[in-house]
Amino acid sequence: MGLLRIMMPPKLQLLAVVAFAVAMLFLENQIQKLEESRAKLERAIARHEVREIEQRHTMDGPRQDATLDEEEDIIIIYNRVPKTASTSFTNIAYDLCAKNRYHVLHINTTKNNPVMSLQDQVRFVKNITTWNEMKPGFYHGHISYLDFAKFGVKKKPIYINVIRDPIERLVSYYYFLRFGDDYRPGLRRRKQGDKKTFDECVAEGGSDCAPEKLWLQIPFFCGHSSECWNVGSRWAMDQAKSNLINEYFLVGVTEELEDFIMLLEAALPRFFRGATDLYRTGKKSHLRKTTEKKLPTKQTIAKLQQSDIWKMENEFYEFALEQFQFIRAHAVREKDGDLYILAQNFFYEKIYPKSN
C-alpha cells in the first residue's frame, strides 16, 4: 500500500481516499437499512403470531369467563427504566420461563415512547387482562406506570421495577448511545462515531448530558399524567413516591440487584424459583455491560449535583433505596457475610368455633 501511495499521483491519491470514504458511508448506510428492515420484519412476525393466537382464541370460544387457577391468573409488569440493569434482569426471566411454566412478552412501543396514547392504553389493559393463553405472564418494556384501576379492572397486575443512582444511569446511557454494549456489539447506535467523553460533554454544556436528561426515573414511576413529564415537577416526584409505595410490589436498586432477585424468588416462586442460583452461579450470559464507559470526574459529578433536577431525582432514588432496604431487613438474616431468607414467622391460634 505504501509503494502504491508513492507511485500514485497526489490527485489520484485524493480521489482514492474520497472513493474509500464514500464506499464506507454507503456500506454503513446499507447496514443501517438492513437493521431497520430486520426490526420491521421482527415486528411483522410478532403481529402475525399475536393474530394467530387471537384467531385460535376466537375459534375455541372466548375464555375470559373461564376460571383460571389463582396461581395461574397472575400478571407481572416490569416497566423497566433504561440503563438500570433491566436487560440483565429480564434475561433471567427468559432463562426461567420454560422451567417455571410462564410466558415472557416484550412491550415494544414505537421509538421506545414511554407514554401510550389513550386508545393504546385501553387496548393494552384489555389485551393483557383477558389474554388467558399468556397467563401467568411477565410483561416488560420501557413504558411509564399505568394505573389499571381507572379502567375498571378487577384484578390489577403486579408491578416491579429497578432504579439506579441517577448520575450513574445517565453516564451509562450516554456511552450506550455511542458505543453500545456487549449484548449486541454489531448494532449501530444513534450517536455512533461521537468520541466526546461525558466529562467533555458536561464541560461544554452539551445537550446529551444536560441535567434535564436526569429526569427519567421519576416520570416512569409517576405515570401517564402530563405533569409527570414536566421536568422538575414537585408534584410528579410526590406522585412517583406514592406509586412506589402503594402500587409496586417491589422496587430494587441496580447496585443491590442480587438481593432484589433473592426477595422476588422468596415472595413469588411461581416466577422466580431458581433465579438467585442462576444469578450467582450461572454462566452470566444474562449480564450486559456498556462498552467504552469512562467514569466521570469528581468535578463533573459536582457540577451535575448543583442542579435542582439532580436533587429531586436523587431524593427519589434515596427514597426507593430506603424502602428496599427496609423490606430486605424484615425478610432476610445475615450469617457469615451471606444473606438467608427468613422462614415463615407467623401462625394461627385460638381458632373458634372448635371443630368436632
Curated annotation (Swiss-Prot):
N-glycosylated. One of its GO terms (cellular component) is Golgi membrane. InterPro entries: Heparan_SO4_2-O-STrfase, P-loop_NTPase, Sulfotransferase. Residues 1-11 are cytoplasmic. One of its GO terms (biological process) is heparan sulfate proteoglycan biosynthetic process. Pfam families: Sulfotransfer_2. The keyword Membrane applies. Disulfide bonds join 201-209, 222-228. The chain crosses the membrane at residues 12-28. It is found in: Golgi apparatus membrane. Disruption phenotype: Mice die in the neonatal period, exhibiting bilateral renal agenesis and defects of the eye and the skeleton. Uronate 2-O-sulfates are not detected in such mice, however, the domain structure of the HS is conserved, due to a compensatory increase in N- and 6-O-sulfation maintain the overall charge density. The active site is at 140, 142. Its EC number is 2.8.2.-. Widely expressed. Expressed at higher level in lung and brain. Weakly expressed in spleen. Signal peptide: none annotated. Residues 24-51 form a coiled coil. It is a single-pass type II membrane protein. The keyword Transmembrane helix applies. Adenosine 3',5'-bisphosphate binds at residues 83-88, 164, 172, 279, 285, 290, 293. GO terms for molecular function: heparan sulfate 2-sulfotransferase activity. Residues 29-356 are lumenal. It is an enzyme of class 2 (transferase). Catalyzes the transfer of a sulfo group from 3'-phospho-5'-adenylyl sulfate (PAPS) to the 2-OH position of iduronic acid (IdoA) or glucuronic acid (GlcA) within the heparan sulfate (HS) chain and participates in HS biosynthesis. Required for metanephric development of kidney formation, suggesting that 2-O-sulfation within HS is essential for signaling between ureteric bud and metanephric mesenchyme. Belongs to the sulfotransferase 3 family. This is Heparan sulfate 2-O-sulfotransferase 1. It comes from Mus musculus (Mouse).
